[in-house]
Amino acid sequence: MEKGTSDSKMRLGKSVGLLEGQVGLRQGQARTPATLRNPVRDPDGGKYEEYGYNAQLSNQIPLDRSIPDYRPKKCKLMTYPDDLPQMTVVFIFVNEALSVILRSIHSLVNHTPAHILKEIILVDDNSDSVDLKLNLDQYVNKNYPGLVKIVRNSRREGLTRARILGWKAATAPVVGFFDAHQYANAAHGYSWALWCMYIIPPQAWLDRGDQTAPIRTPAMIGCSFVVNREYFRDIGLLDPGMEVYGGENIELGMRVWQCGGSMEVLPCARVAHIERTKKPYNNDIDYYAKRNALRAAEVWMDDYKSHVYMAWNIPINNPGVDFGDVSERIALRKKLQCRSFQWYLQNVYPEMRVYNDTITYGEVRNSKASGYCLDQGPDDDNSAILYPCHGMTSQLARYTSAGLLQLGPLGSTTFLPNTKCLVDEGRGRTPSLKKCEGVSRSSQRLWDFTQNGPIISRDTGRCLEVEMSKEASFGLRLVVQRYSGQRWTIRNWIKPPRH
């Protein structure tokens, strides 16, 4: 199917400015990257900015295109039963380049046994593009009658509710959910901000020595997953209260494991994804990722929800984020008799670092310079600085019950460096930031602190203070010296503040 198409397909492809079969740019045909040798000026004035990828190039390479096979070599030797259940594939899109959507369809049809692929459902989350209305309808009706169905939202619903709509339209016993900018071709973890990342597979999988074996994974990337249709219904689908983008994939991972299921990455699956430089849904993706993370934390993470608030550097009480009503999701958890998040950490994601010893966290301000906050400064400098307060994670401080004062983003998993400690080494007048386990005496990293009081080194008795300096940024620098009356505050308290 990759080697040619009918004349009628060729005519229709040309009518919408696209190229099928073996015609078009030769680059990119034989599993190699494609570039435009003589790119023409984009008449629309910035499609790359619009789509977050090179749509001009996409429009000039064939719709039938293979990708490199990066799977373990043993995958090519594997065989599968002929009686696998039929599958519905749901593609979600909004304002996608037409050629990218059609290439996803071609790739899926070309690489999937026909008796397994029952239907393809395209969910248009209220796109603005004319191309994605008449031209898309015309193309799929002509080329894939009965196989490809289009469902359209009358308003922009966001990825989560668009996927739920696709599930409702599906009729096969197995449903696969994919972004529409994919080709058919490590385990997936996440940080305490509930942001997905790749992690090393569990040691048990590594010890097994079989690179083709399924990998137990705590969560998943949201752009490609496959699930039994009825099971997905029984565990509550995706959370329809999630807005726009982010978090739904992490929430599903926690829910599946805590409620008696399992989640796996299949190394022999072959799916490639175009990572867009710009998301089409909203310019404020960080806000919705934060909102959805808090929503998941409130339902599934028990007392560990404080870690999510900490990771985003916002207060637990009155965080300034409306994550909506979670009562129905809490009722679902109770109905399904799901396990605790503590069980999940111990049995599914033991690589997560926990910060239960935190007393207070957030911005640290000094009475002498209240508009400036303690900041980790450049990563390679190992020196804390004062910087105008902005609330980002470089100004996330944590004071622990042991007396550590740590500064910078949480080292959420053992795959990442842990947050550094503020240290008074007793030499000179400047404190340093060091790996907590790397100090010569443990007392050098310990401090006494009370809210609206001094920060005192337990090792030297000197106080962390601020002094004016022409050489320092913003005219202020941190020093350790005899107490001069300066006071400090840390914004957020998990345990009652000590005065």
Predicted regions and their residues:
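N-proximal low-complexity "stem/linker" segments adjacent to membrane-targeting elements
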Residues: 1-110
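Active-site nucleotide-sugar/metal-binding loop of Leloir-type enzymes
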Residues: 109, 142, 164-174
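Acidic donor-binding segment of Leloir-type glycosyltransferases
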Residues: 109-152
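A recurrent flexible, glycine/aromatic-enriched loop bordering the glycosyltransferase active site
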Residues: 160, 192-226
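Short beta-strand-to-loop acidic/aromatic patch adjacent to the donor-nucleotide binding site
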Residues: 172-182
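A short, conserved alpha-helix in the catalytic core of glycosyltransferases
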Residues: 219, 223-236, 241-269
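Active-site-adjacent helix/loop segment of glycosyltransferases
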Residues: 262-356
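Lectin-like carbohydrate-binding module/patch detector with strong preference for beta-trefoil
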Residues: 344, 350-499
